[in-house]
Amino acid sequence: MSDHNATPAAQDENHIIAERREKLAQWRQAGRAFPNDFSRENTAGKLDEVYGDKEPEALEASPVEVRVAGRVMLKRVMGKASFITIQDLSGRIQLYVQRDGVGEDVYADFKHWDIGDIVGCVGTLFKTKTGELTVKASEIRLLTKSLRPLPDKFHGLTDVEQKYRQRYLDLIMSEQTRFTFVARSRMVQSIRNYMINHGFLEVETPMMHPIPGGAAAKPFVTHHNALDMELFLRIAPELYLKRLVVGGLEKVFEVNRNFRNEGLSPRHNPEFTMMEFYEAYADYRSLMNFTEGLIRQAAREALGAESFVYQGRELDLSKPFHRLTIVQAIRKYHPGFSEAQLADAEWVKEKIQAFGEKVKPGGLGSLQLQLFEACAEAELWEPTFIIDYPVEVSPLARASDSNPEITERFELFIVGREIANGFSELNDPEDQAARFLAQAQAKEAGDEEAMYYDADYIRALEFGLPPTGGCGIGIDRLVMLLTDSASIRDVILFPQMRPE
């Protein structure tokens, strides 16, 4: 295929790739391509931790032999001796390669290796004149030939779309990206440990549901050929987890993916990770305390601190989290709004429109929630539990004993974003059936996010669900918070993208 229409940069890249393929062909012919018999015993970061402060004389007096491997990121060839810097997950280390140290034939080959190649090296540690910890190579081998050139080391990946599409390249080039996903892994592990240490059992529930449920969202639809039935990728695991509590598994949790056929935004990806947990004989108040402790623990494990900077602004998780009702939150940021005005549905509708939002159908509680989302939610920088949600927008939550119009429900907001949603579970099967019926009628009227009627879940409740509290925590949004990431795509390894 002709390259005459390619840009100069593309032509240069194609030329580099062709040269590297030719080198690979020569190594194949020599029987040295892609060996798999080099064992690494040391990592760059650990060597720096143990020997980085050693005096040069100490390393010379007691030679330390090491076996390292990694990707070549820098290379300086200087006649009979050269320096290269290799990178592994833990960091970087410099290698000193001499013709007299590795042999004339190996050194001749080495001079043709490229940035991006993966090498293995055996040698001893020493310090250069500038004090840099370095491996003096006695053996060095090409383990993997890189056929494509890496981006310019000074600019890295400047195309954000390319970062997300080619995450493998982003991970090679960006220390911040590597930090983000290592921190994510540590955070998820700390959450698992926290749950297990508090007596919870980790479980797995179906990803394909005959009836979508557990959240107000539009599902992805698929088809099972053998059973000839329509199935839905799960939007939430809630109803299955509560079935397990009915069965006697009194403290359960699951960390897994949910799928919602909705829009893309800096806070939304169609495929995302949630941690949901349910505890018998707990209510929403005890769950708020538990969630507060869990999030602090996650911060300590990921960052080593409970106080940090997010997007240039200080955030302190060590202080007690605030607790406000929807009306209290609105009035905190708009003290001119009176309680009487907020109890007037027509007045609330006018205010929703005044903030530039469309009014969705609903009663007073739904309207107050819409106004809160329009004028107060984004202001909740410090960790804040918004409590006592209206029944009409909480079809799975238990109604308050003191006010049947509201539920024992909370949502946790940090930096103006919802991080968690929890409530005392509705365990009255007749009340739940009536709410499912109302949701089904709303769906028939055109509400795509209204829930389906789940007869099997009602049957499970009829066997008896003990008083139970449940909560879902958005893992991706929590990682965004703890890694100072502005977009959810920065914390998902392979986010959903439009076709190239």
Swiss-Prot record:
Cofactor: Mg(2+)
Gene3D superfamilies attached to this UniProt entry: Bira Bifunctional Protein, Domain 2, Nucleic acid-binding proteins
Co-factor remark: Binds 3 Mg(2+) ions per subunit.
Positions bound to Mg(2+) 2: E418
Keyword GTP-binding: no
Keywords: Aminoacyl-tRNA synthetase, ATP-binding, Cytoplasm, Ligase, Magnesium, Metal-binding, Nucleotide-binding, Protein biosynthesis
CDD domains reported for this sequence: LysRS_core (cd00775), LysRS_N (cd04322)
Reaction catalyzed: tRNA(Lys) + L-lysine + ATP = L-lysyl-tRNA(Lys) + AMP + diphosphate
GO MF terms held by the record: ATP binding; lysine-tRNA ligase activity; magnesium ion binding; tRNA binding
Main location group: cytoplasm
Binding site for Mg(2+) 1: E411, E418
Transmembrane segments: none
E.C. no: 6.1.1.6
Superkingdom: Bacteria
InterPro entries: Aa-tRNA-synt_II, aa-tRNA-synth_II, aa-tRNA-synth_II/BPL/LPL, Lys-tRNA-ligase_II, Lys-tRNA-ligase_II_N, Lys-tRNA-synth_II_C, NA-bd_OB-fold, NA-bd_OB_tRNA
An example Gene Ontology CC term for this record: cytosol
GO terms, biological process: lysyl-tRNA aminoacylation
Compartments where located: Cytoplasm
Entry annotated with the keyword Transport: no
Main enzyme class: ligase
Family statement: Belongs to the class-II aminoacyl-tRNA synthetase family.
Subunit note: Homodimer.
Protein name: Lysine--tRNA ligase
Protein's organism: Azoarcus sp. (strain BH72)
Lineage: Bacteria, Pseudomonadati, Pseudomonadota, Betaproteobacteria, Rhodocyclales
Gene behind this protein: lysS
